[in-house]
Amino acid sequence: MKVALTGATGFIGSHILTELREHGHEVTALVRPGATFVPPPNVRVMRGEPLDATALAAALNGQDAVGCCLGIRRAGKAPWSALLSPPDLMTRVARLLVSVMPRAGVRRVVAMSAGGVAESITQCGGVIRWMAGAGNVGVAYRDLAEMERQLSASRLDWLAVRPVTLMNGPPTGLAGKVDRYGLFSIVRRSDVAAWMLGALSRPTPFVEQTVLLGTLTTGWG
């Protein structure tokens, strides 16, 4: 499988890059011009901004699917930390994908979203609900909701992955669809990456367009 990957230098994207390579897939990574990135062997790197339609089209040429692991960045972990990205970054990325992918002959995209986005807020406990709307976290969540709406209005074969609280650590193989997101719900980034690779590789179109992804032993906090 040939996969175009955006956000390959990020926390999730770097794990997906590893998964793709280890499973023998061909990867084209679209990387910002100023980003420090030493590509692993057999990874094709194209330098360009994610909002540059020309760069995106070049990266998508000849691909079978797209893995989108971009997201709004903040200066710190606090909800009110300053934004380092445009407040509508993912909305604009989605619009570009909807425009560019059909012309490149690519239908499938698996995009990183977040637990608590859109209607999944009803699956969240009180603290998570508060955090999802607080400060610039709320800005990012509203942007992701609009990203999903843009994809939903398209004819793409798309899936938005909504992980619960992300943690580091080696893969456990326990990532899967959950129906609640509580204070103590966690999922490892490496497990999310492995699950997303499985989604990218599915032989049939997606039936569900969103999935709340957690650890299958996660409880309700």
What residue ranges belong to the model's regions?
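N-terminal Rossmann NAD(P)H-binding glycine-rich loop of SDR-like oxidoreductase domains
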Residues: 3-23
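Conserved beta-strand positions in the Rossmann-like core of class I SAM-dependent methyltransferases
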Residues: 4, 28, 159
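Conserved SDR Rossmann-fold cofactor-binding beta-strand/turn motif
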Residues: 31, 113, 162-165
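NAD(P)H-binding glycine-rich loop region in Rossmannoid oxidoreductase-like domains
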Residues: 35-92, 96, 100-103, 201
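Active-site-lining helix/loop region of Rossmann-like oxidoreductase modules
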Residues: 79, 139-141, 150, 167-221
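Conserved Rossmann-fold NAD(P)-dependent oxidoreductase catalytic core, especially the SDR/UDP-sugar
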Residues: 81, 95-139, 153
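Conserved beta-loop-beta element that borders a ligand/cofactor-binding pocket
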Residues: 148-169
